[in-house]
Protein backbone atom coordinates (compact mmCIF):
# COMPACT_ATOMS: atom_id res chain seq x y z
CA UNK A 1 0.00 0.00 0.00
CA UNK A 2 1.24 3.44 -0.95
CA UNK A 3 0.75 6.39 1.37
CA UNK A 4 1.07 9.95 0.19
CA UNK A 5 0.93 13.19 2.12
CA UNK A 6 -0.07 16.20 0.10
CA UNK A 7 0.35 19.71 1.41
CA UNK A 8 -1.71 22.47 -0.11
CA UNK A 9 -1.53 26.18 0.20
CA UNK A 10 -5.28 26.66 -0.18
CA UNK A 11 -5.45 29.29 2.56
CA UNK A 12 -2.79 31.37 0.83
CA UNK A 13 -4.56 30.95 -2.51
CA UNK A 14 -7.87 32.02 -0.95
CA UNK A 15 -6.19 35.08 0.52
CA UNK A 16 -4.69 36.07 -2.84
CA UNK A 17 -7.99 35.46 -4.61
CA UNK A 18 -9.88 37.68 -2.14
CA UNK A 19 -7.24 40.39 -2.58
CA UNK A 20 -7.62 40.23 -6.36
CA UNK A 21 -11.41 40.19 -6.09
CA UNK A 22 -11.26 43.32 -3.93
CA UNK A 23 -8.83 45.28 -6.14
CA UNK A 24 -10.02 44.28 -9.62
CA UNK A 25 -13.10 46.58 -9.85
CA UNK A 26 -10.97 49.62 -8.95
CA UNK A 27 -8.31 48.63 -11.48
CA UNK A 28 -10.94 48.25 -14.20
CA UNK A 29 -12.44 51.66 -13.38
CA UNK A 30 -8.98 53.22 -13.47
CA UNK A 31 -8.22 51.55 -16.81
CA UNK A 32 -11.53 52.70 -18.29
CA UNK A 33 -10.91 56.26 -17.15
CA UNK A 34 -7.46 56.11 -18.76
CA UNK A 35 -9.11 54.83 -21.97
CA UNK A 36 -11.47 57.82 -21.80
CA UNK A 37 -8.52 60.21 -21.59
CA UNK A 38 -6.90 58.42 -24.53
CA UNK A 39 -10.08 58.87 -26.60
CA UNK A 40 -10.23 62.58 -25.73
CA UNK A 41 -6.61 62.92 -26.86
CA UNK A 42 -7.34 61.13 -30.15
CA UNK A 43 -10.41 63.32 -30.81
CA UNK A 44 -8.42 66.49 -30.09
CA UNK A 45 -5.49 65.36 -32.26
CA UNK A 46 -7.68 64.44 -35.23
CA UNK A 47 -9.68 67.66 -34.93
CA UNK A 48 -6.50 69.73 -34.80
CA UNK A 49 -5.36 67.99 -38.01
CA UNK A 50 -8.67 68.93 -39.66
CA UNK A 51 -10.05 65.41 -39.99
CA UNK A 52 -13.26 63.91 -38.62
CA UNK A 53 -13.59 60.73 -36.59
CA UNK A 54 -13.74 58.66 -39.81
CA UNK A 55 -10.41 60.15 -40.99
CA UNK A 56 -12.03 62.31 -43.71
CA UNK A 57 -11.07 65.99 -44.05
CA UNK A 58 -13.52 68.53 -42.66
CA UNK A 59 -15.61 70.52 -45.13
CA UNK A 60 -14.13 73.98 -45.81
CA UNK A 61 -15.31 77.05 -43.90
CA UNK A 62 -17.72 79.42 -45.63
CA UNK A 63 -16.23 82.47 -47.39
CA UNK A 64 -17.79 84.82 -44.84
CA UNK A 65 -16.29 82.92 -41.92
CA UNK A 66 -12.89 82.74 -43.66
CA UNK A 67 -12.91 86.53 -44.08
CA UNK A 68 -13.75 86.93 -40.38
CA UNK A 69 -10.87 84.64 -39.37
CA UNK A 70 -8.42 86.48 -41.62
CA UNK A 71 -9.54 89.84 -40.23
CA UNK A 72 -8.97 88.56 -36.67
CA UNK A 73 -5.58 87.06 -37.59
CA UNK A 74 -6.70 83.52 -36.77
CA UNK A 75 -5.64 80.44 -38.76
CA UNK A 76 -7.96 79.61 -41.64
CA UNK A 77 -7.36 75.87 -41.52
CA UNK A 78 -10.56 73.94 -40.70
CA UNK A 79 -9.72 72.53 -37.27
CA UNK A 80 -12.62 73.73 -35.03
CA UNK A 81 -10.09 75.49 -32.75
CA UNK A 82 -11.27 79.10 -32.74
CA UNK A 83 -10.20 79.72 -29.13
CA UNK A 84 -9.51 76.17 -27.94
CA UNK A 85 -12.27 76.52 -25.36
CA UNK A 86 -14.64 73.90 -26.79
CA UNK A 87 -12.05 71.15 -27.15
CA UNK A 88 -10.47 72.08 -23.82
CA UNK A 89 -13.82 71.46 -22.13
CA UNK A 90 -14.03 67.86 -23.39
CA UNK A 91 -13.43 65.48 -20.48
CA UNK A 92 -13.98 61.80 -19.67
CA UNK A 93 -15.75 60.60 -16.55
CA UNK A 94 -16.94 57.36 -15.07
CA UNK A 95 -20.47 58.00 -13.95
CA UNK A 96 -22.31 55.21 -12.19
CA UNK A 97 -25.50 56.10 -14.12
CA UNK A 98 -23.95 55.02 -17.44
CA UNK A 99 -23.47 51.52 -16.14
CA UNK A 100 -20.59 49.47 -14.93
CA UNK A 101 -17.33 49.56 -16.85
CA UNK A 102 -18.23 52.51 -19.08
CA UNK A 103 -16.71 55.93 -19.57
CA UNK A 104 -18.58 58.99 -20.76
CA UNK A 105 -17.08 61.90 -22.68
CA UNK A 106 -18.79 65.22 -22.11
CA UNK A 107 -18.26 68.95 -22.35
CA UNK A 108 -18.06 70.78 -19.04
CA UNK A 109 -19.90 73.97 -20.03
CA UNK A 110 -23.28 74.52 -21.71
CA UNK A 111 -21.82 76.99 -24.21
CA UNK A 112 -19.34 74.35 -25.40
CA UNK A 113 -22.07 71.72 -25.61
CA UNK A 114 -23.96 74.07 -27.93
CA UNK A 115 -20.89 74.67 -30.13
CA UNK A 116 -20.16 70.96 -30.37
CA UNK A 117 -23.80 70.15 -31.16
CA UNK A 118 -23.82 72.79 -33.90
CA UNK A 119 -20.66 71.39 -35.54
CA UNK A 120 -21.65 67.76 -35.11
CA UNK A 121 -25.35 67.89 -36.02
CA UNK A 122 -26.86 71.22 -37.05
CA UNK A 123 -24.25 72.87 -39.25
CA UNK A 124 -24.35 72.29 -42.97
CA UNK A 125 -21.87 70.93 -43.93
CA UNK A 126 -21.46 68.84 -40.78
CA UNK A 127 -18.05 68.44 -39.22
CA UNK A 128 -18.36 65.23 -37.22
CA UNK A 129 -15.44 65.23 -34.81
CA UNK A 130 -17.12 63.63 -31.79
CA UNK A 131 -16.96 59.88 -32.26
CA UNK A 132 -14.62 57.02 -33.01
CA UNK A 133 -14.13 54.38 -35.67
CA UNK A 134 -13.06 50.73 -35.48
CA UNK A 135 -9.35 51.61 -35.73
CA UNK A 136 -9.59 54.04 -32.81
CA UNK A 137 -11.51 51.47 -30.78
CA UNK A 138 -8.74 48.91 -31.38
CA UNK A 139 -6.06 51.39 -30.29
CA UNK A 140 -7.94 52.16 -27.08
CA UNK A 141 -8.62 48.49 -26.41
CA UNK A 142 -4.90 47.65 -26.77
CA UNK A 143 -4.05 50.50 -24.40
CA UNK A 144 -6.57 49.22 -21.84
CA UNK A 145 -5.24 45.66 -22.11
CA UNK A 146 -1.62 46.82 -21.64
CA UNK A 147 -2.66 48.88 -18.61
CA UNK A 148 -4.46 45.93 -16.99
CA UNK A 149 -1.55 43.54 -17.63
CA UNK A 150 0.89 46.03 -16.07
CA UNK A 151 -1.34 46.50 -13.04
CA UNK A 152 -1.90 42.78 -12.51
CA UNK A 153 1.82 42.02 -12.86
CA UNK A 154 2.51 44.71 -10.28
CA UNK A 155 0.22 42.94 -7.80
CA UNK A 156 2.40 39.80 -7.99
CA UNK A 157 -0.45 37.36 -7.78
Segments the model singles out, each with a brief description of its role:
Residues 1-157:
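Short, Lys/Arg-rich flexible segments
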Amino acid sequence: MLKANIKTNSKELQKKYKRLEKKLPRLIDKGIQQAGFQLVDIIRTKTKKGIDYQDSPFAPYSEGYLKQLQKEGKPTVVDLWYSGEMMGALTPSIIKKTGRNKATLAFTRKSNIDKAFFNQVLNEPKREFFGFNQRTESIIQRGFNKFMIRQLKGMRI
